[in-house]
Curated annotation (Swiss-Prot):
UniProt domain F-box: residue ranges: 7-53
InterPro entries: F-box_dom, F-box_LRR-repeat, LRR_dom_sf
A UniProt-annotated Pfam family: F-box
Organism: Acanthamoeba polyphaga mimivirus
Name the record gives this protein: Putative F-box protein R757
Domain of life according to the entry: Viruses
PANTHER family per the UniProt record, alphabetical: MITOCHONDRIAL ATP SYNTHASE COUPLING FACTOR B (PTHR13382)
Amino acid sequence: MLFILIFSVMESLPTELAYHVLSFIDFNSVVTYRLCSQESNNFIKSMLVFFPINFNNLVDQSTNYFEFVEKVDLQFCRQITDEFLSSFCRVKIINLRGCDKITDSGLKHLQHVKEINLAGCYQITNDGLLGLNNITFIDVSYCPKITFKGFANFNDDSVAVVQTRPLEYPKSKPYTLVDKKKINIRYYNNHPFLGKNNHAFQKDTNQSHSKNSISYLPRIIIAPKKIIDKIETERCRLFDSIYAVKPEFRDRVFMKNYEDLLPNTHLYDKQSALNRLYKKSNRRKFIDNLLSNKMDIMIGGSIGLFCTHKRCNFEPNDMDLYLKYIDSEKIRKIESIIYQSFIFRSIVVIRTSITITWLIQSTTDEITSIQLNIMNIKSWAEVFITYHADLTCIGYEILTNKFVYLDNRWNNILQNDTNYFSNILNMESANSIYKAASKYQQRGFTCVSLNDLCTDIQGNIAKSYDHHIYDSLVSLLSDKIYNKLNIHTSDTGYQNYYQKKYTNTNLIHYIFDKYRMSENISFASSVSHLQLPKIYPDIIMLSVYKINEILDTQQNNNTGTEFHQLSIHKQKNYINKTEKFFYSARSGAQYTGINHYNKLHTVCIVCKCGCDSFMTMNDFIGCQYEYSLDRGICSRIQCREYEYLELFLV
């Protein structure tokens, strides 16, 4: 066998070079070669002082091959349990980041460990740490059951990484005394081995890039004013109609069954549409697992269009997921299903203001993107009314096994050959809408933008597009009020998105190209690491939208007045507290630009202890959401009790 020949050659190599070659060989081949002879067994044992395990389907049955290991990387091996760790009696350095099935019982097998990463092992408690008597470095980020009491048996001057800050953690002291021992508390992991692929991966995205220029995109027609006014009015009326209906009835009234449009020469029949949806086996397995877990999810975006419309000249490598009544447990369940459904080389999880995206790199280097929208929605109609164009207002509802669409939007494309893109009901800049229209123009559809890129702050037509000039009302407001530019709420399209294969090296380039102009973005190793607030918010972002007068008096639930999905529950009694913040910015918000909007909706966070302290969006737009809540507020407010409030500028 070829791998036996490879190992035979390796035995003659210097140790350092043999280590390097071994890192490119899969785990099963290593184990198989060990069983060939006594000599091969001895060679592998000598090499297994450290061996990287970089796949996610490692299970407890593989426990007999690690008795000589002293340094091991098991991060993201989600299937291993406490039993698996019983073989690591000699290990001194171990990375268990994201191994969330590990409990205190498993740590009893690691008596000789000196350096360990337990980030995301949320079942670990103080009792488990008390048995680790030789610790010099530990990462317990996102382990909510651990406090300082768990550090009592650590060595003096040990380093403890605690990226999520419990109530008792100090505000700024680098050292803390625990049972007369000096513990070095850190909020980041820079360990040369245990810190690789750490929770945050940030790059400066403030610089302009030539590929972001409009000149790189196919020319899109700008609609005349008469058409713009007509379509804006129609979409705003539909928006008002949807939000005038109680949430539990919205889908029944506004969502229609795709099969009602059949037969149609432009559309596939249902079975053909399902065949296109299930074309990839891993996608089918993922959808089947969502169904077996009874997840009330709709798959929207471009994949719905690909499955149903015959004009599509593309095959998406992504899935956009929408989940009703979202909460942190449902998010964790989705991530668990992802790990069950895909065999992958690596996963990068990216958090923006309204999405969590899993970039899944398979063992053949193919990229699959699963993007979960984390807006707190109650109906699919709320999702589709915010879409840029009618073109993508169709999706697959998993529980009912149906393709569904928003009436008076997606069915329009069967009568009208032209697809109009707008930013009426969201905060996208005209630049972003132009790029979205360009993407679908490349995909074989006729697209027209309702937003003129070449407009300055006063509304005058500019001779050419300049990215330094405000291109929308949102850019103006975000700069005047928050001193932030290029704030995006969703991914914008670049021509180089759609390569199908990426190596380990250029995967990072893919990510950076995709998100480079977005400031409000964070990278996390696992959703289980994201500390979501007790009262789960709808969304945290700057949003300009129309508030329906009907909803000011209509009580739809016991929490108060319901607003558009880009909102936080209204808390009128706190508005006076933050008036001083908005006083200086009020003059900059007088210009509304679009007559459909009559209020600016924004949000801040206030302390509930009565100290009148608060943190505005100015402090955490563009920051990592989960860190800013814990670190930003706690650096100023003594307690961790906080809540969200809604503020308006009229």
